[in-house]
Amino acid sequence: MRFQTELVPARLTRRYKRFLADCVLDADGAEITAHCANPGSMMGLAAPGTRIWLEPNDDPKKKLKFGWRLVDHENGHFTGVDTSLPNRVLKEALVARHVETLSGYGTVRPEVKYGQNSRIDFLLSEDGLPDAYVEVKSVTLSRQTGQAEFPDSVTARGAKHLQELADMAQAGHRAIMLYLVQRTDCTSFTLAGDIDPTYAAAFRSARDRGVETLCLGTNITPQGIEVAGAIPIRL
């Protein structure tokens, strides 16, 4: 997935009210407010002075003319902070059949209603194969070098999704909990059970009921984001 417009570098001044970020543009020192499309805590990613990358827009319907897309760790690694992008990134990979364990499916349908007033991120289908229900979570937390974690805050909604996936597995479908690590500096994944023990318990229950788990890495640059290889899950 390529960004729609060229990203511009900036320095973060502060992130507040979850969805707002005051920044200073590198180019001219202008002070602007950007949209932060991330409802999580963004632990370790929003310190004042952090180098970030913004995507400008000229949409007259949007009050904020920049969207915060990346954190630049200034060591060659990036983190994608926009939680609306992983589904776009993964859809491209699924349609191109680049996700090995799901490459047998030719039909990819996003946002299909299921469960208790929920929508599954992707429903995959193919003649001769059981339907595959795929729920996607964006992973940005890393508290230990090289290790990604989820979640970065309490997520009752996430636990509900696991329960609904387990119901699909029990009904004879494939049900996949897919964690997309939006960091280029992580080589393993685990659950942040200390942050949300209820989610960790729901994960274990769902796995015992037949839910498959998959973690994928990403290649991230200021030009775009694409799915990389599988990352081992260590629980």
From Swiss-Prot:
Q: Which HAMAP family match?
A: SfsA
Q: Which InterPro entries match?
A: SfsA, SfsA_C, SfsA_N
Q: Which family does it belong to?
A: Belongs to the SfsA family.
Tell me the superkingdom of the source.
Answer: Bacteria
Q: Which organism is it from?
A: Roseobacter denitrificans (strain ATCC 33942 / OCh 114) (Erythrobacter sp. (strain OCh 114))
For molecular function, the Gene Ontology terms on record are: DNA binding
The record's annotation in Pfam families points to: SfsA, SfsA_N
Recorded protein name is: Sugar fermentation stimulation protein homolog
